[in-house]
């Protein structure tokens, strides 16, 4: 528990360090104008930037039209401003935002999404749309259509939205998961009650804990492609109740391991999106690199069911799979003003490793619904369901592995700081399995007495992360 508390403090300490650095920078240097909404440097977005003057004479800037519309909406409408001006895409001159004409959904993404581009003259907007695509609209349509954020980011599933060329984010993540109930199919029981109910039961798992610290990186080399990397470090703990064959008493043994896990790499390609930037369809391809340790040491005794020596260390305690894995699937996202929906259908192939062990393949579907009351906050719920095939060791299917799990989580995003030409978010997720049907295997001991090989389930999981997002301004 002390280790968990110490690890949970890492994001908080990192956050305090970032705030201290930012305060120091403001004290030592002349402030550099940044977007009021997303934090991007204004001098890198001169071609698309907007200028907003409030009733009291104070002035703010945004990197482009999308963030301008969000700031107007957050302030309660145009009545909160003395003037709002945008840069004409053709001449570069500031023009009144209300009288400007806009092109939405073209092939050009100059700032944050959706990609509204302003023109002083309607005929020039129409000529641009004829060349680059998109829909020609006026200010009223743009204002009514804009959402507080260009997209939201789910936790356990993926988004179909790609944010635009040059978008970059890096984060630190702390995760914790605990399982504490014996599952035989869809029924759960306390581990102590399970082993005490059958004197022939030699052992039973009692509790598993997994802590994960990770560095995550996202980068978009093009407008339609987003790349992702996850570099994890695991701390795992597994408790087992074991019956002394001589005395019949039950004791508990604890196994621990920690180290680098398998590095995950993913790419999302957005092959279709609507002109209004409210519907998206993408394909996902991913792999893991076998950087985590897999202990292939085998039990010296032949397993009577498998008729071979099986891997001694449990699959749940292994840090890696000792082989590359492959994931593919489809993603779909849709927006309704302040609401975002994300869905995914993925399949992961786990090939056999060099120790003749293969984790079961996994089919997963997911659905997320997020609400964004303003551009700083997201609240949501996420549901994911997976079916995992049984693990195999030398071709023998491990009976107490695999099954069906459905998880429900509540999630949140809070953008708490604009700094360094971007913004920082504090992301959190807490959830639990709401349905499990886990595989078990009935067996008999040497005396012919029946017992059951089972898995752990139920429990809960949670994640906390700090993410910094920045976009390298495109050259238009």
Regions found by a protein language model. Name each.
Residues 148-291, 298-343, 347-349, 364, ...:
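Transmembrane beta-barrel domains of Gram-negative outer membranes and organellar outer membranes
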Residues 11-20:
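Bacterial N-terminal signal peptides
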Residues 32:
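Residues immediately within or flanking Cys/His clusters that coordinate Zn2+
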Residues 39:
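Cys/His-coordinated zinc-binding microdomains
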Residues 80-146:
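Thiol/selenol-based redox catalytic cores and closely related redox-interacting motifs
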Residues 23-27:
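Boundary at the C-terminal end of the N-terminal hydrophobic targeting segment
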Residues 2-12:
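Bacterial N-terminal signal peptides that target proteins for export
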Residues 35:
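Short cysteine-rich clusters marking metal-coordination/redox-active sites
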